[in-house]
Amino acid sequence: MSSGNAKIGHPAPNFKATAVMPDGQFKDISLSDYKGKYVVFFFYPLDFTFVCPTEIIAFSDRAEEFKKLNCQVIGASVDSHFCHLAWVNTPKKQGGLGPMNIPLVSDPKRTIAQDYGVLKADEGISFRGLFIIDDKGILRQITVNDLPVGRSVDETLRLVQAFQFTDKHGEVCPAGWKPGSDTIKPDVQKSKEYFSKQK
């Protein structure tokens, strides 16, 4: 895995690349196009594979939930935009994606995967990296899975909600926090209010 330039608490590496958009058209997009929104940017190894469509379809099917949080989901792989489009145009029952609600970025030169530190150089493909970038373009969360295991849309949604909550309220979120759960005031005395309720 490459070391990359993606570091928590720092600006996420910008990119400009061709994507297949939800309307089926090709469009050059940049990360900077989404400034003012949260972004979930995830990499997957290859089009026309096995775990990848389950993840991409799961994120696409729930794109509206992310949109309600002012969050854009973007997928990326090293395949060409033509390959992405062919996969989108292949029916789900034949291993395709079907219509998408999220852009799929093409990274054939592997520069974006390299920048984000998810390039599996010996195979020229990406590990399953997922990056949460806040509305100021700052990288807040990184997860990287090895190739055989897919990611959880529920957990990604929870993390976006948690980061947005801490941004807005200045309180911190304990393990497993979900909207409506108790949070912790980051102060030695005030935090006791949370801990005093624990069993």
UniProtKB/Swiss-Prot annotation:
PTM note says:
Phosphorylated on Thr-90 during the M-phase, which leads to a more than 80% decrease in enzymatic activity. Acetylation increases reducing activity and resistance to superoxidation. Deacetylated by HDAC6 which decreases reducing activity.
Q: Which reaction does it catalyse?
A: a hydroperoxide + [thioredoxin]-dithiol = an alcohol + [thioredoxin]-disulfide + H2O
Cellular compartments annotated: Cytoplasm; Melanosome
Q: Where is the composition biased (Basic and acidic residues)?
A: 184-199
Q: Known PROSITE patterns for this protein? A: THIOREDOXIN_2
Recite the UniProt keywords alphabetically. Acetylation, Antioxidant, Cytoplasm, Disulfide bond, Isopeptide bond, Oxidoreductase, Peroxidase, Phosphoprotein, Redox-active center, Ubl conjugation
Which parts of the sequence carry N-acetylserine? 2
Q: Which GO terms describe its biological process?
A: canonical NF-kappaB signal transduction; cell population proliferation; cell redox homeostasis; erythrocyte homeostasis; fibroblast proliferation; hydrogen peroxide catabolic process; leukocyte activation; natural killer cell activation
Enzyme Commission number, as recorded: 1.11.1.24
Q: Which residues form the Thioredoxin domain?
A: 6-165
Q: Which conditions up-regulate this protein?
A: Constitutively expressed in most human cells; is induced to higher levels upon serum stimulation in untransformed and transformed cells.
Q: Which residues carry this modification: N6-acetyllysine?
A: 7, 16, 27, 35, 136, 197
Q: Phosphoserine modification sites?
A: 32
Q: How does it assemble?
A: Homodimer; disulfide-linked, upon oxidation. 5 homodimers assemble to form a ring-like decamer. Interacts with GDPD5; forms a mixed-disulfide with GDPD5. Interacts with SESN1 and SESN2. Interacts with FAM107A.
Also noted in the record is: The active site is a conserved redox-active cysteine residue, the peroxidatic cysteine (C(P)), which makes the nucleophilic attack on the peroxide substrate. The peroxide oxidizes the C(P)-SH to cysteine sulfenic acid (C(P)-SOH), which then reacts with another cysteine residue, the resolving cysteine (C(R)), to form a disulfide bridge. The disulfide is subsequently reduced by an appropriate electron donor to complete the catalytic cycle. In this typical 2-Cys peroxiredoxin, C(R) is provided by the other dimeric subunit to form an intersubunit disulfide.
Q: Give the similarity note.
A: Belongs to the peroxiredoxin family. AhpC/Prx1 subfamily.
Function text: Thiol-specific peroxidase that catalyzes the reduction of hydrogen peroxide and organic hydroperoxides to water and alcohols, respectively. Plays a role in cell protection against oxidative stress by detoxifying peroxides and as sensor of hydrogen peroxide-mediated signaling events. Might participate in the signaling cascades of growth factors and tumor necrosis factor-alpha by regulating the intracellular concentrations of H(2)O(2). Reduces an intramolecular disulfide bond in GDPD5 that gates the ability to GDPD5 to drive postmitotic motor neuron differentiation.
Name the PANTHER family for this protein: PEROXIREDOXIN-1, THIOREDOXIN PEROXIDASE
Q: What is this protein called?
A: Peroxiredoxin-1
Source organism = Homo sapiens
